[in-house]
């Protein structure tokens, strides 16, 4: 799923001083949404392009317009989407993740499962596939986040791992019924770009 969903980080009755942060959160959410769409579409191609193409840029711009963006916000979000996808296409790990050659590969894979307590849960896995070389199943969650001002890479990865380890653990439990293969879970940060594996208990 796309980043930036914590609307609860914005007060219920924000004052004027909160508005820039609210706009920033909205742009980050929309960038994440369109990056997810772009990576899904690329993963369905028989072969990955070496570069972002003009048709792709126009399609992503239209997706952002449909989300309600225009003017400077549209230009800023469009540039962020294009840069994230460029970085993924230029990254060997990104190209490996997006390759259509993996068996049992799915993007934006929708599942419905029951928790141990019987609660029904819907989930969408950004990318999953079997790695033929290792025989392992990968579950990968895309993130467009980057370290904050003054935040080290180690601090950033620790924070993101803590935030999403429960979500990835749920994905792993749901996917375990598909076969006996070992399952590895990771976050892929498109803006860095970096594949960061999570060690889940």
Regions inferred by a protein language model and the residue ranges of each:
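Non-catalytic protein-protein interaction segments used by genome-maintenance enzymes to assemble
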Residues: 5-11, 28-35, 114-169, 173-178
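A non-catalytic, helix-rich entry segment at domain boundaries
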Residues: 11-117
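Short coil/turn segments at beta-strand junctions that form active-site/ligand-binding loops
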Residues: 103, 134-136, 181-183
């Amino acid at each position: 799923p796309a980043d930036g969903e914590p609307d609860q980080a914005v007060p219920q009755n924000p004052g004027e001083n909160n508005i820039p942060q609210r706009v920033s959160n909205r742009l980050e959410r929309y960038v994440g949404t369109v990056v997810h769409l772009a990576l899904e579409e690329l993963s369905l191609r028989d072969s990955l392009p070496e570069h972002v193409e003009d048709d792709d840029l126009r399609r992503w711009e239209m997706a952002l317009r449909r989300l309600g963006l225009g003017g400077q916000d549209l230009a800023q979000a469009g540039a962020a989407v294009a840069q994230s996808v460029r970085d993924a296409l230029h990254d060997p790990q990104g190209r490996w993740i997006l390759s259509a050659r993996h068996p049992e590969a799915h993007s934006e894979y929708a599942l419905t499962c029951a928790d141990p307590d019987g609660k029904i849960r819907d989930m969408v896995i950004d990318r999953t596939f079997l790695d033929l070389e290792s025989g392992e199943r990968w579950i990968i969650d895309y993130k467009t986040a980057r370290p904050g001002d003054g935040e080290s890479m180690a601090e950033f990865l620790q924070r993101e791992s803590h935030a999403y380890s429960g979500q990835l653990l749920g994905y792993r439990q749901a996917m375990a019924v598909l076969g006996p293969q070992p399952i590895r879970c990771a976050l892929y940060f498109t803006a860095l770009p970096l594949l960061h594996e999570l060690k889940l208990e």
